[in-house]
Amino acid sequence: MFHKRILTRRDKFLLLSLIPVYFIVCGFILQPFSEIWPGIATLIKEPDFLITDYFVVGGVGAAFLNAGVLTLLSIALIYFLDMEMDGHTITSACLMFGFSLFGKNLFNIWAIMLGIWLYAKYHKTHMSHYVYVGLYGTSLSPIITQLMHIGDLPVAARFFLALTAGITIGFLLPPLAAQVHHAHQGYSLYNVGFAGGIIATVIVSLLKSFGITVESRLIWYTGSDFLFFTILSILFLGMAAGAFYFGGRGVVAVSYTHLRAHET
């Protein structure tokens, strides 16, 4: 029962996919089906600047569905690019899920990913070299939504502006992320976040120079503490059980070794 099991590449990706699937199922349980799709539409149409809590904007079920589907798509993208699972895979999936609860949605991430793809094509390299930069760089996705709400421009003009901005962001992120690494010499854990912050500062400054003000928001969900405690407890207990099932006695041995090392 407690023997270590060898996982194939496919098994690893399927296991990681269980987390977003779990939240998608929770979403359908927590919100009526008839309310989820209007909730998703509201998430896409609403401005996404901080703080815009999707639990309030579209409902808990719609927020979980949005985050779960985006995370599944991110995992699938990495899988079908024939990449091996590593720390970046897990980190990017978890960040995608977390920030898809406030800011990223099924509409606004794709222009940036298209820019990343065009950058790879321009340099005649495989998309796998830059996919994690793209997934981390979707932290700038709220800019796409914000540009769709500019003034009295026609919808087609706003869409073209948002698409162009997203592609430009995606195209600039890989070289900028490589350069800012030299600035902090590895002392920033969020290298793409640093690069994204620079791009966001420039874009907001440009908007202000054209008289377009970016209003901050404070839409924050409160309550349902026991509900989320229950949902997360089931998830974490399942993850622990999975670790024992697939890792065998080695999980206990490694945990005990780390505990003794900290004590000494």
Name these PLM-found stretches:
Residues 2-102:
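N-terminal signal-anchor module of multipass membrane proteins
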Residues 74-80, 96-104, 119-124, 142-148:
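Hydrophobic alpha-helical transmembrane segments
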Residues 143-165, 173-228:
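Membrane-interface helix-loop-helix junctions at boundaries between adjacent transmembrane segments
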Residues 257-264:
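Conserved small/polar residues in nucleotide/adenosyl-binding loops
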Residues 78-88, 103-109, 121-131, 181-188:
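Membrane-helix interface "capping/anchor" motifs
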Residues 16-31, 70-78, 95-99, 116-117, ...:
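Hydrophobic core segments of alpha-helical transmembrane domains in multi-pass membrane transport
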Residues 91-95, 108-112, 116, 120, ...:
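Alpha-helical transmembrane segments of multi-pass membrane proteins, especially transporters
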Residues 245-254:
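Membrane-interface capping segments at transmembrane-helix boundaries
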